[in-house]
Amino acid sequence: MQSDIYHPGHSFPSWVLCWVHSCGHEGHLRETAEIRKTHQNGDLQIRGGRGRRESTEIFQVASVTEGEESPPAICMEVFLFLWFIAPIYACVCRIFKIQVRNTVKNSSTASLAPSISTSEERQIRIERHHYHLYGQ
């Protein structure tokens, strides 16, 4: 069975209309009358010729283009948007914080000379002392 959907000035795919109805948006969207003509001849749609059966039904669908959303629906959309964005924001902040820490660790702004351990300092003092003794 093949069906043609006639909208006054609009042509929405049927999956959009099903999605709108299943999500419950018809409460805050203006409903309009729609005429659906169904041509039956096996599984093929016939554009002309004899033996064509046609049935017409009128039913209500939500208009996607017109109507105002209710405040609870707007609040729900904002909540879902923030619920989706929060993990991404936290991940970006964590990556940025790790990058800043690595940059601070690798920079040598505290001292231009490389830091040396206490054992290396002792070795340098001993060598200077011996050099001083041998130099006299």
Swiss-Prot record:
<keyword id="KW-0472">Membrane</keyword>
<keyword id="KW-0812">Transmembrane</keyword>
<feature type="transmembrane region" description="Helical">
    <location>
        <begin position="73"/>
        <end position="93"/>
    </location>
</feature>
<dbReference type="GO" id="GO:0016020">
    <property type="term" value="C:membrane"/>
</dbReference>
<protein>
    <recommendedName>
        <fullName>Gilles de la Tourette syndrome chromosomal region candidate gene 1 protein</fullName>
    </recommendedName>
</protein>
<keyword id="KW-1133">Transmembrane helix</keyword>
